[in-house]
């Protein structure tokens, strides 16, 4: 009987710890509006240096003057510049 209890205690502790960690992790996530997750296309041709300035996973930029948009090099933080029609 005692040996059976020795097996169940670590299993129960592991179960409760994993359940609590998953619940606390879910509470920490911030919910974003659907409009916040929509990306615009970057109008212009970013160079290699600008392609290294990546957005966060929540499509946010560190600098408020920049917006997260998508290009051929991925999602980058960039000041959108309208092109003059040189396609």
Curated annotation (Swiss-Prot):
GO terms of biological process kind: antibacterial humoral response; innate immune response
GO MF terms held by the record: serine-type endopeptidase inhibitor activity
Stretches that traverse the bilayer: none
Keywords assigned: Secreted, Signal
Primary location class: secreted
Any coiled-coil regions, as ranges: none
Signal peptide: 1-25
Keyword Heme: no
Cellular component terms (Gene Ontology): extracellular space
Protein's cellular compartments: Secreted
Additional remarks: Although this protein was isolated in a region containing several WAP proteins and was defined as a WAP protein, it does not contain a classical WAP domain.
Protein name, entry field: Protein WFDC11
Organism of this sequence: Homo sapiens (Human)
Primary gene name: WFDC11
